[in-house]
């Protein structure tokens, strides 16, 4: 493999694909993991219509398309669509030839084995890459924060994980996974707006709600206290939001009621434990000797951890759960929305990592199962 070929780093999330070149400090392209198929093929004579649209283009034309997400809860469910997303990433977004660059892909923890094999197969057979590697998202987030031991609380659009890592090795028996993340909060926000008399129902309107959620929501340090405040002095929590058509709407207690579901999933009718309990249970599944280090290195990652005050609230909740003398430290890096990608960029540009790649020769010799031997 030529020395000068820079690796490509592609972080496939349920909501967004983050991609770019190894060594950069931020992804070059970020676009929604969406495929759009026209509802009425070729209805417009003389209009050039594609068979399918990917990413932002699908987002912009969503009125005439049926939208599909090939990655559900962090796991690829439709490989043909996934291949289209990768094709779009390489050729339209990054504008590179994949056969000239090694590619680092990311995967969810506890990913089915067949999924990793299929990823490997598509990279070598459809894109003809010279080398590739698959890394678990949480490890990359930890590397990006400059640590090798800690518990990563990664919450994106489709899935939330708590992953304990010791000296760079994931402890798989202690991973907790909840299929409750950003997308569920967006749906909950839509429901809260309905109660206020605003209706948002279509996929197009869902994107507006997602934007409101990302711009205006925050975590209450004390939920009951905040509710009381919002009832007594509404103006303290109210904010205005301008819709695309120019109308203004008022957003009030929804601002903290929506993300509260992270700590209390029963608000949205889910039986799973809250974020703090999931993290605590993960730590308790680990050896007693390393728990202290984990409590002291709780690293947040992913877009759904971007709410204001989430670090403080998590610290309070964990302090209540942990043994009295335990020191709790929550690390919330400002760039945590992209920390998986940043960790991938760091890892793939290390000189010591270059011998870790799965090469085309190794793949031709062993087939897709090589991924389990080389990527762990």
Curated annotation (Swiss-Prot):
Q: Does the record carry Cytoplasm as a key word? A: yes
For ATP, which residues are the binding ones? 14-16, 18, 157-159, 213, 303
Q: Which reaction does it catalyse?
A: ATP + H2O = ADP + phosphate + H(+)
- Report if keyword Magnesium is assigned: no
The record's annotation in PROSITE patterns points to: ACTINS_1 (PS00406), ACTINS_2 (PS00432), ACTINS_ACT_LIKE (PS01132)
Choose one Gene Ontology CC annotation of this protein and give it: cytoplasm
The EC number(s) given in the record are: 3.6.4.-
Q: Which residues carry this modification: Tele-methylhistidine?
A: 73
Which GO-annotated molecular functions does the record name?
ATP binding; hydrolase activity
Which superkingdom, per the lineage? Eukaryota
Keyword annotations of the record = ATP-binding, Cytoplasm, Cytoskeleton, Hydrolase, Methylation, Nucleotide-binding
The cellular location(s) given in this protein's UniProt record come to: Cytoplasm; Cytoplasm, Cytoskeleton
Residue stretches spanning the membrane: none
Signal peptide limits: none
Q: How is its activity regulated?
A: ATP hydrolysis occurs in the polymeric state. Unlike for mammalian actin, ATP hydrolysis also occurs in the monomeric form and the release of inorganic phosphate (Pi) is more efficient.
Q: What does this protein do?
A: Actin is a highly conserved protein that polymerizes to produce filaments that form cross-linked networks in the cytoplasm. Polymerizes into longer and more stable actin filaments compared to ACT1/actin-1. Has ATPase activity. ATP hydrolysis leads to the formation of a stable intermediate ADP-inorganic phosphate (Pi) actin, which is followed by the release of Pi. ATP hydrolysis affects filament stability; ADP-bound actin depolymerizes much faster than ATP- or ADP-Pi-bound actin.
UniProt miscellaneous comment? ACT1 and ACT2 differ in their polymerization, filament stability and helical structure. Unlike mammalian actin, Apicomplexa actins do not form long and stable filaments.
Note the subunit structure: Monomer (G-actin). Oligomer (F-actin). Polymerization of globular actin (G-actin) leads to a structural filament (F-actin) in the form of a two-stranded helix. Unlike for mammalian monomeric actin, monomeric actin is able to induce oligomerization with ATP or ADP. Mg(2+), which is used to coordinate ATP, is required for polymerization.
The text of the family note is: Belongs to the actin family.
PANTHER family attached to this UniProt entry: ACTIN
Q: What is this protein called?
A: Actin-2
